[in-house]
């Protein structure tokens, strides 16, 4: 018997978003054609990109794939756990994954009551983020207080895998060199 969390898209959410984006596109078209100086802002292209991003986020299989990739990359990382995806129960509109039994990192007093060292926790979050970015080139790009939890045994557990980052080998090397420059106070490297 396993406890799971289920994320379900609201009924008609795609239709609602598309109607809003249609209105935004019309506004972008009007502004860009009436105020010539706004052409350089490429408002129509911005709305088109927003539509593409929104359509991807409306398919929960993409979020599941991102969570699964992070899970595979970090399954041996001490102190960091990603919820497992249950693919047999996941679809375009439904995401099924392990339930998080933890405390949000915004609940400082509750964390302290479990003897969680807040400064160490902050350091650990940064180290995990950088490890994922530099080692794997794939990282959770939305690690705010609402998306990070801590289990009773001190593991950091992220949720919401809709916004992820990817770095190619060259950018990972560049990031590592910048970080090394900061650590060594070699600001020419930075």
Which residues does each PLM region occupy?
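Conserved catalytic cores of large enzyme domains
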Residues: 1-190
């Amino acid at each position: 018997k396993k406890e799971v969390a289920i994320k379900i898209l609201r009924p008609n959410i795609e239709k609602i978003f598309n109607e809003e984006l249609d209105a935004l596109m019309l506004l972008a078209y009007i502004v860009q054609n009436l105020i010539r100086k706004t052409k350089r802002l490429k408002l129509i292209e911005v709305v088109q990109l927003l539509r593409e991003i929104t359509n991807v986020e409306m398919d929960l299989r993409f979020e599941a794939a991102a969570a699964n990739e992070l899970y595979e990359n970090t399954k041996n990382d001490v102190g960091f756990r990603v919820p497992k995806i249950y693919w047999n129960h996941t679809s375009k509109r439904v995401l099924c994954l392990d339930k998080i039994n933890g405390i949000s990192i915004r609940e400082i007093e509750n964390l302290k009551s479990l003897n969680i060292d807040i400064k160490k926790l902050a350091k650990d979050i940064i180290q995990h983020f950088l490890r994922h970015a530099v080692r794997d080139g794939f990282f959770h790009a939305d690690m705010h207080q609402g998306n990070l939890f801590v289990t009773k045994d001190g593991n950091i557990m992220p949720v919401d895998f809709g916004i992820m980052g990817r770095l190619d080998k060259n950018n990972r090397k560049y990031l590592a060199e910048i970080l090394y420059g900061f650590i060594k106070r070699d600001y020419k490297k930075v």
